[in-house]
Amino acid sequence: MVAELTALRDQIDSVDKALLDLLAKRLELVAEVGEVKSRYGLPIYVPEREASMLASRRKEAEALGVPPDLIEDVLRRVMRESYTSENDKGFKTLCPELRPVVIVGGKGQMGRLFEKMLGLSGYTVKTLDKEDWPQAETLLSDAGMVIISVPIHLTEQVIAQLPPLPEDCILVDLASVKNRPLQAMLAAHNGPVLGLHPMFGPDSGSLAKQVVVWCDGRQPEAYQWFLEQIQVWGARLHRISAVEHDQNMAFIQALRHFATFAYGLHLAEENVNLDQLLALSSPIYRLELAMVGRLFAQDPQLYADIIMSSESNLALIKRYYQRFGEAIALLEQGDKQAFIASFNRVEQWFGDHAKRFLVESRSLLRSANDSRP
């Protein structure tokens, strides 16, 4: 039996090595694709191409008796690596006549990411940090674009302290709140103004499939090329007004981060045994715990700034607290029927999204379980 098992495992090892050879060949081809895309200014990520390719491979897998979900999982991971590989090949310069780009806060993580992407796209990039401020007027005197990438609580102050910029200079900020920084930029500069919010962390590796929100400020025709450049990097652009942006971010960021903070605080105060929780956890709880731990591995100032960026955030969090109290009252009353009625009402509100989220979450949970030690 042992000899038979060993022989089969040896065959599996041979197949795995053949897979490695094929993956290496695919990455070589991807590198060539990256060079072509870079030369012609084509975006890294083309959703139609990806969807068509995955649909074809799923059909072919089914015909071979291979689970379609398996080949899709494998290909999605391979494509993620491919996007990172293409990233390193550089990008076409869509505005070759642009004067130097100056990133204020260029030593921060997001500032460094934009410095890297703009550099890969052939632009001259300079950075301006607090120790360089005495030279700010000189550094900014011939800037073609200035990107503000500083902590939220400093954004408006830094914008107000900018020396006069060239009239055609594009002033951009990357803050995760938009209305007040946008108004500050419009007041500080008479030229083109653009508000951006990258909806991802600086450790993403590639901008492929990442969302970048933009809010028009002034003279959008002057920065249209920059939006197109971001699309070439592979990102998905979403346009919204600054006011609507901040209203949505109250849910996406402020409320979510506060709830995560409160849950982490509760775990710490209860002094639970984390190792034991992890050993006993289901995939969904392990994933949730990872998201909580991830928050506390990052900069507390950033999250304090996001959560406390407006009074409307506090009002929303208070309403959440109130509904928590209403839900606890159901438990205190032992009213299962009222609980079920509330559950069904929320289910109806989610509509078809609930079933779609159920399907989407399955793949996330499988992946979380696969990576379990």
UniProtKB/Swiss-Prot annotation:
Compartments reported by the entry: Cytoplasm
SUPFAM superfamilies (UniProt xref): 6-phosphogluconate dehydrogenase C-terminal domain-like, Chorismate mutase II, NAD(P)-binding Rossmann-fold domains
GO cellular component: cytoplasm
Domain Prephenate/arogenate dehydrogenase: from-to ranges: 99-361
Record pathway: Amino-acid biosynthesis; L-tyrosine biosynthesis; (4-hydroxyphenyl)pyruvate from prephenate (NAD(+) route): step 1/1; Metabolic intermediate biosynthesis; prephenate biosynthesis; prephenate from chorismate: step 1/1
Catalytic reactions on record: chorismate = prephenate; prephenate + NAD(+) = 3-(4-hydroxyphenyl)pyruvate + CO2 + NADH
Gene3D superfamilies in the cross-refs: 6-phosphogluconate dehydrogenase C-terminal like domain, Chorismate mutase, NAD(P)-binding Rossmann-like Domain
SMART domains reported for this sequence: CM_2
Pfam families per record: CM_2, PDH_C, PDH_N
Domain of life according to the entry: Bacteria
GO molecular function term, any single one: prephenate dehydrogenase (NADP+) activity
Any GO BP: chorismate metabolic process
Entry EC number(s): 5.4.99.5, 1.3.1.12
Entry annotated with the keyword Membrane: no
Domain Chorismate mutase, first and last residues per copy: 1-90
Family the UniProt entry places it in: In the C-terminal section; belongs to the prephenate/arogenate dehydrogenase family.
Record-linked NCBIfam families: CM_T (TIGR01799), PRK11199.1 (NF008400)
Protein name: T-protein
Recorded name of the encoding gene: tyrA
